[in-house]
């Protein structure tokens, strides 16, 4: 893989399969394919060269700060390591990478993202340290200094929670989605036989925005799997996944999606010292009433959190099913124009 800097050079990363272990290396090349002047012909070592490493992922931090690399390395089975690398090729953290998780058994299926300011990153993975089932665990990364604080448990259910996805949706705000094995044990026979999607969020300076085990994102018959999040419009993002709810005698895969919106902050403690912060969730009357082009929903929250936003018609049919990311406590607002009916 390669990451381009602000000019015409590229940092390239590769797996070198040399007995007794595969190892990770990197170098810089110019647009003409030649190794940059002064850089070693055989590249720099990224991982410990004496033990195996794989599942490398690299993302650009900024035009000035270089890149962040995250990978699996053999240790207590499969561990998670990371390294910040400047555009000059210098590793910013400890040699061979800084350990993110070196617990017993496997830590795998790594996902990470960097916020829009390039000041923080968040790494999540599926974790088998208890030896009986997989949980989703994450860790905040301060890109100026390295890992911060303690690991964050997003799940602790006795079923398997696996294949996490993390996406930065604003400065210091991250959405986390995963495949959840509770779908195999639903009490409703119409909703069993496959993994469901659950989710949470993480806000730098606050923490995770839901209780342990998250909130349901899509709980339907058969599998809801392979989630992805892409930029949609403005501050909105589109969460989309493969969905097998229509399966019968044979599996039938469709594509489903829902919008992740960010609410407008009407007031918070960051704006006025005399604002009274609510102690619980509350929604106000919708206005204007009757409907006049667009209606607004005002609500209050006492902490950053994910809010389920649903609109129903008079027959009870769901016509809006969205997730609202509210990144601060206080008074918030979302609007709806009825155009998606």
Indicate where each model-derived feature is located.
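C-terminal outer-membrane/trafficking sorting elements
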Residues: 272-341
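Low-complexity, Pro/Thr/Ser/Gly/Ala-rich linker/spacer regions in secreted
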Residues: 261-277
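Extracellular, repeat-based ectodomains that mediate carbohydrate processing or recognition
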Residues: 4-266
């Amino acid at each position: 893989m390669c990451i381009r800097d602000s000019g015409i050079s590229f940092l390239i990363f590769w797996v070198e399969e040399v007995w007794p272990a595969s190892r990770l290396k990197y170098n810089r090349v110019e647009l003409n394919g030649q190794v940059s002047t002064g850089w070693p012909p055989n590249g720099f070592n990224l991982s410990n060269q004496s033990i195996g490493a794989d599942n490398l992922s690299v993302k650009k931090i900024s035009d000035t700060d270089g890149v962040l690399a995250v990978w699996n390395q053999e240790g207590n089975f499969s561990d998670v390591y990371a390294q910040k690398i400047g555009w000059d090729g210098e590793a910013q953290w400890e040699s061979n990478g800084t350990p993110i998780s070196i617990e017993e058994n496997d830590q795998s299926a790594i996902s990470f993202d960097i916020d829009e300011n390039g000041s923080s990153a968040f790494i999540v993975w599926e974790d088998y340290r208890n030896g009986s089932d997989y949980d989703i665990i994450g860790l905040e990364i301060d890109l100026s200094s390295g890992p911060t604080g303690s690991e964050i448990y997003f799940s602790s259910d006795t079923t398997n929670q696996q294949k996490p996805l993390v996406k930065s949706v604003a400065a210091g705000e991250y959405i986390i989605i995963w495949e959840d094995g509770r779908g195999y044990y639903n009490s409703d026979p119409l909703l069993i036989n496959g993994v469901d999607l659950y989710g949470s969020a993480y806000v730098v300076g606050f923490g995770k925005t839901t209780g342990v085990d998250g909130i349901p994102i899509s709980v339907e018959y058969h599998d809801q799997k392979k989630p992805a999040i892409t930029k949609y419009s403005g501050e909105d993002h589109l969460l989309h996944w493969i969905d097998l709810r229509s399966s019968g005698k044979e599996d039938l895969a469709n594509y489903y999606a829902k919008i992740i919106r960010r609410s407008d902050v009407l007031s918070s403690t960051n704006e006025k010292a005399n604002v009274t912060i609510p102690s619980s969730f509350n929604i106000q009357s919708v206005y204007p009433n009757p409907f006049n082009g667009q209606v607004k929903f005002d609500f209050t929250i006492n902490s950053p959190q994910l809010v389920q936003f649903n609109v129903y018609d008079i027959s009870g049919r769901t016509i809006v099913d969205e997730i609202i990311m509210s990144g601060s406590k206080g008074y918030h607002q979302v609007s709806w124009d009825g155009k998606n009916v």
